[in-house]
């Protein structure tokens, strides 16, 4: 039972579909991408190997072109992000290898998601429809961080790095750019990647950002 008078410390994950409303992509393809992302999230939540995800997700809500998900534990947020990117990378590879598609069709059907993760204090608030949402500057920070990413990366706040830097499932790279977002929200930004992708990311630089 959620208490509206209590403060909670959570990990906040925002998944954002890149170029979701691009005028260069037909509307039916845009909707197809949104549906594929929904199926991807649903599959991770309900897969036989990761069924415990259902218990680890505190809250989930659609943002229109992505999802906002709250986790109790930081490692669960990182694992979920890795699974999302694995699933969509496999999807993109299948599209790329289908000889029936032109390069233009491949480009339009390729699904890229950017991911932002923050952590900190939030408080439950009642929405106009009666549902409970969570509010706090650290919640907003996750949305700001995901707007900073480009090209399908997982970016984290400095607090996530401090809490999770010893995790065994991946590595953090300091992008060496202290950012100041709207409403004076500030954080260093860290790239997080799966250890299996070390060769791809070990020489990454800050130019992956906007």
Which residues does each predicted region cover?
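Residues immediately flanking
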Residues: 15-17, 109, 119, 158
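Catalytic NTP-binding/metal-coordinating core of nucleotidyl cyclase/transferase enzymes
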Residues: 1-83, 87
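Catalytic/regulatory signature loops of cyclic-dinucleotide turnover enzymes
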Residues: 137-159
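Amphipathic alpha-helical segments in well-structured domains
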Residues: 34-38, 81, 135-142, 172
